[in-house]
Amino acid sequence: MPISSPGTRCSSDLKDPTLQQYSAESVSTEQSLGTFEESKGSITENYVQDSSVDEHDDGNWQPMEVISLEPTHLINDIDDDNEIIEEKKETEKVEESELEPRYTRVFRDEDDDQKHQLDSEAIKLLDIADHGNEEISMDSQLEITGNILSETEKMAYAGVCRLLILKMVDKIACFTTLPWYRGECKAALEDTIMWADKTTSCIYEHLGVTVEEQKMIENLHKHSVQIDDLSKILVSAHRAQTVSSLDAVLVDEVESSDSLSSLGKEKPVQIDVRWTVLCDLFLVLISKSLYDCRSRSLLMAVGEVLDINEFDVAKFEKHIVETIQIDDTGELEAGSSANTEAVMKLRRKVSRRKKYILMGLAGIGGGLVIGLSSGLLAPIISAGIGAAFTTVGLSGVATSGFLAGGGSAALITAGGAISGAHIGTTGMAHRKADVKTFEFRPLHAQRRANVIVTVSGWMLSKEDDVRLSFATLDPIVGDIYSVFWEPEMLASAGQTMNILATEVVTQSLQQVLGSTVLVSLMGALQWPLILTKLGYLIDNPWNNSLDRAKATGQLLADMLCYRSLGVRPVTLVGYSLGARVIYYCLRELEKKKEFSIIENVYLFGTPVIFKRTSWLKAASVVSGRFVNGYKKNDWILGYLFRATSGGIGRVAGLRQIDCIPGIENIDVTNLVSGHLAYRESMPILLAAVGFEVLDEEVDLVSEPIPEPLRERQSQLLYEIEAEECQNKQKELIEKSLMQKGRSLSPKKSNAFFDSKKIREELKKVKKKYGSSFNSRWY
């Protein structure tokens, strides 16, 4: 799968000379996979009696007695419904002379799975200050990590952080060197520089770096000192730390002692300095309330240069949050800062004025377009109406001078203008309607330090679960929430993507009407409808979905600004219309100058026209990865979006974005069969971009509509359309007859409006189009 380069970093060739002090040379690092070692959370040793079981006999199991340092243990278990059940198990008492001593510690949640167990070197570090306690204070852990690091390692630690911070500033500053740059990222650059200075000062203060040492670190990039040169000091270093043998049993798999009295002895344990640096940096950022999206990106970058992958860093981050007492953990809880209804009400108030202006413009435009076309074709329409009246025996009305005179033209023009204004106003009101349904639905909510927000592109029905496409995401990556927005709109999105078939049905209806009494009338009305297409352009469901996705994205930005999901970094993932929601969320965050929220963004099949200045602003909000997944032969997205947008611009979901540094482009043509397959292919796509997934299969995702059900839906469609044709014809004829004081008898009416005949005509259309008709519809 081709992945385009995110672009080169700029070091000193910046348009603003004041930015040169924050530029750093490009640093390339190789990411290596960390090994997964089983944690020392539960250390058990099996003992059997010497004479009861033969050494080579594995036929029967013998009862095994255990000894515990505590009289009881609370063992957390998880049932099929993911509900934690606490079960208290009594410990059997045995004599010390019969068994060797052992110590058991039970971990929570998914730590029982070896994949989710913390690295043994990281456990050593945390268990130094634990001493068997459930939680560790932040101050005590910071004191321990500070004592472990030597002066040389502290300098290397500070230098690595400073060079990586300069590299992050350089990522935004590089935008200013683009030839078409016009100051779009000025606010983002200023905010990033402020964060860089504040974070660097906190690290210097914590490590006790002197003024002279600070000057030396600030000039490292000028002397061609690379990050790899400093990271080697930290990667190869180990520090011996004296801990109790109780903790040593937990973290170093030392040999068992002969008695319980040996647990009080002291012995040294080798500590990996890499985990010491990560733990120290994370706690410093948390303690100073600096842990935003940029700080987490810095933590991941430090882990990368220390040869620790993001998955291991996420496990370590989770373990620290769970075991260390952090004063402001309440900020990690969702909904702690804002009320959803209040934010939605505020957004409605802001968009109301713009909505009324657009409705007025649509009404004026609709009246002009339909009024003018009706006036130009008034003679033809009058002739058609006269021919229709002649068909039903109203020759007097057909030959009257009114239809042939100027009065009929004025009446038809006025009626067209009034109906056009009504169509334009109501269509725009529907298109610019406020978001009525918006909700964060949790998939995994365990108070992690980061949160992932997923946005679906459509639903199979209003009762569909928007979390299904992302259900296989590994919960270790963070708290996961899915946005439940406008279910009616999402349920109809799949139908709007079949607009080609809608056009075919429209043509078939015209053929059916052509075989009835209103031949001349429909022939005259066909041209003004084709010329205007106003109802199609304004009230088309696809256009409504696009506008509602934009409004939802703005509302999502409001929610994130008010910290509805807590004060923590946010990663956004979406496909199809969900990707459009995320794009306009980024645009709104840039307008609000909120650059501390979004860490990573992953978009797939985005129905957004590419405009480089707009996408540059959206990219300036993202501190980490910005991934654009596209499918080159997505004909559904190409036809629908380009048709409704007049073919202007280029669709991001169909091509790569290669003129903005920092955006990664991934071609998913070989991974996704079509646009409608994005929903069930999300586990595969997430794994392709680097997410940890529990399973790439789509068992948890609902299957497509079966073929028999599709045929039944097609048959129902024909019947509904036939009834609509019948009702429209009946209403027109009865209205004309009422003006003359006449009416059709029920018997003649039933014979005249035979829905069975209309249904047969529709079936002929189906037979004419054959299999191509069904394939285009579905």
Curated annotation (Swiss-Prot):
Start-end of Polar residues biased regions: 1-11, 18-34, 41-51
InterPro entries according to UniProt: AB_hydrolase_fold, DUF726
Membrane topology: Multi-pass membrane protein
GO cellular component, one term: Golgi apparatus
Record carries keyword RNA-binding: no
Span list, region Disordered: 1-60
Places the protein is found: Golgi apparatus membrane
Key words of the record: Golgi apparatus, Membrane, Transmembrane, Transmembrane helix
Main localization, broad class: Golgi
GO molecular function: AP-1 adaptor complex binding; hydrolase activity
Annotated TM spans: 356-381, 401-423
Family: Belongs to the TMCO4 family.
Descriptive protein name: Uncharacterized membrane protein C6F6.13c
Organism: Schizosaccharomyces pombe (strain 972 / ATCC 24843)
